[in-house]
Design a protein with these regions (language model features):
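Hydrophobic, regular-secondary-structure patches
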Residues: 11-96, 209-213, 219
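Short beta-strand boundary microenvironments
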Residues: 41-42, 65-77, 81-147, 159-161, ...
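Small-residue transmembrane helix packing/gating motifs
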Residues: 46, 124, 165-205, 224
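Interfacial "coupling" helices/loops that link adjacent transmembrane helices in transporter permeases
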Residues: 238, 252-294
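Peri-transmembrane interface segments
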Residues: 35-39, 208-253, 262-266, 287, ...
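Alpha-helical transmembrane segments of integral membrane proteins
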Residues: 14-24, 238-258, 295-303, 337, ...
């Protein structure tokens, strides 16, 4: 400990370098944590339906009954919705959103779980209200209680108060009641979509084939397929993490190699004296390299704090339209970062131990 604080410049250089290594690791693992889990959350915790059905035109009462009669084929619950692309108008820019209007006689709770980013449940909007995806609201500076305007391709507008900002990771949605839509658009919503929950043990793909055979059905979309498609797109994050780990390893090697050489060069006489006193080579090496281990541990701890801020900065620079990230770092990622930093240190120390001591 005396030698560590005796050479203060080397102390700060070592801690700064190793903290940078640890911070890179936290950032790499944090990016993976923030990206890889969003697809699963979107299709298991937010959009909880299993199949989306799209009709060519507004459904008729007969078509509604036809879907409801599919219970023996595995349809547990279903709800009809109107889905329409509109522009959400902000003070400085507009963003494209998907407007979801539910059948007034239906309960949306089993199909879409509306909640805040902190997990607080949000009730489906009443007349004159809307619930908006948190990401698009943040981009436009919209807060709960604000009045916003939605505009379609025919320049017709809907003005509503924001009753809640819901967590959503894939695409941007605005949820609206049928009463609000009818009152302001002067027409009934076109219910051309249906959300379907399948019974336990039912193969969604087989049921989807059966639904596709119904009258006027244009498309059937399986949520599991969407989840797998987005997951494969996010698979490149593992490569990014590997690259960051290699960069962190390179940084650790450069810092430890150079500072260890400086340390030994400055203390040649001291090391020679220890050897003359009868210390074995391993004992002499441990005397020198023990300082590296202590400084590495201190640097790794400092890097955890630095890594949190670096991770937030990196995620703020990753902007993907229609996709929001769950910005967080899992506790196990901090453990991985410290362990890998110590492993890098051990490897470099083993590599340099004989070479450096012999040169001394």
């Amino acid at each position: 400990m005396r030698n560590i604080f005796r050479y203060k410049k080397r102390f700060f250089m070592m801690v700064a370098g190793i903290s940078g290594c640890s911070a890179l690791l936290v950032t790499g693992f944090g990016v993976r944590d923030s990206v890889t889990g969003i697809v699963t959350q979107q299709y298991t915790q937010i959009q909880t339906y299993d199949i989306g059905v799209t009709y060519s035109s507004s459904v008729t009462p007969e078509q509604k009954s036809e879907l409801e009669s599919k219970e023996q084929d595995g349809v547990e619950k279903s709800v009809f919705v109107a889905e329409k692309s509109m522009d959400l108008v902000g003070s400085e820019k507009t963003k494209s959103v998907s407007l979801i209007v539910a059948d007034p006689d239906s309960d949306m709770t089993p199909f879409v779980n509306l909640h805040t980013e902190k997990g607080v449940p949000i009730t489906f909007p009443k007349k004159g209200e809307a619930v908006i995806s948190a990401k698009v609201a943040d981009e436009l500076g919209i807060k709960t209680g604000d009045t916003v305007t939605l505009q379609d391709s025919d320049m017709k507008t809907i003005s509503v108060a924001v009753s809640g900002l819901c967590e959503n990771f894939v695409y941007n949605y605005v949820y609206l009641s049928a009463d609000t839509y009818e009152e302001q658009m002067k027409t009934e919503p076109e219910y051309k979509n249906a959300f379907v929950c399948v019974s336990e043990g039912t193969d969604a793909h087989l049921l989807g084939t059966s639904l596709m055979a119904m009258s006027d059905v244009a498309a059937v979309n399986i949520s599991q397929d969407d989840m797998e498609r987005f997951s494969s797109m996010m698979g490149s994050m593992d490569l990014i993490v590997v690259v960051i780990i290699l960069c962190a390893a390179g940084l650790a090697f450069i810092v430890l190699y150079n500072l260890t050489n400086i340390n030994i060069t400055e203390r040649v006489c001291e090391i020679a004296t220890i050897e003359v006193l009868g210390f074995y080579e391993n004992e002499t090496a441990a005397y020198v390299f023990r300082e590296n281990t202590i400084l590495t541990f201190l640097g790794a701890l400092a890097g955890l704090v630095l890594g949190v801020f670096l991770h937030r900065f990196v995620m703020s620079q990753i902007v993907v339209d229609m996709v929001a990230f769950d910005v967080h770092v899992k506790p196990v990622s901090f453990v991985y970062s410290v362990v890998l930093t110590l492993v890098f240190t051990w490897f470099v120390d083993r590599l340099m131990r004989k070479r450096s001591m012999r040169s001394a």
